[in-house]
């Protein structure tokens, strides 16, 4: 019985990766219908341009406010996804914070770094949503931006907001269980952002905290799998296709 969550997680992971691969193969098939182009020339120039635009987000910084917000969300999401390595390891093996014993104090730094970026992403997403739906900047209310483009953009923002919120909620319940010296929750990590939420959960029983921590953990990783496969249907697929 103790292995059931591991089995369920592994099945979920395999299905998510399979479905993503299936969609990517469809996309590849459609791309290959086009005429082949030789792009082996100017390799250095092409690599520099890719790094500048895809990683450096040079096109976005032409507009200072939206540029900074884009960089925060983009860089933050890439950095945040590093924690997926540990979550996947924990999910398959049934461990908890599997990397903590090997990284020592550096692990505390990494988790605090993730939390700060999660907070910045939440702030940036709220500002993005307000600019699009409350302030209604001119470029967002053009006819071509109505319908699916608007809905898609908002869905991406909701995804990011919910994923980062679940990440912080997972951490705050985890840290409270660490404070209670629960044997299954290793004392590891530094939580500068989620610790602000401790008063909300501090009155709950140990059993309730364990249930909530597991709910938030499963919601976070399941949401990531759903988001990964939603990208195929979104204009934000360029997040992946911006790289060679």
Where are these regions (language model features)?
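Membrane-embedded alpha-helical bundles of multi-pass integral membrane proteins
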Residues: 1-244
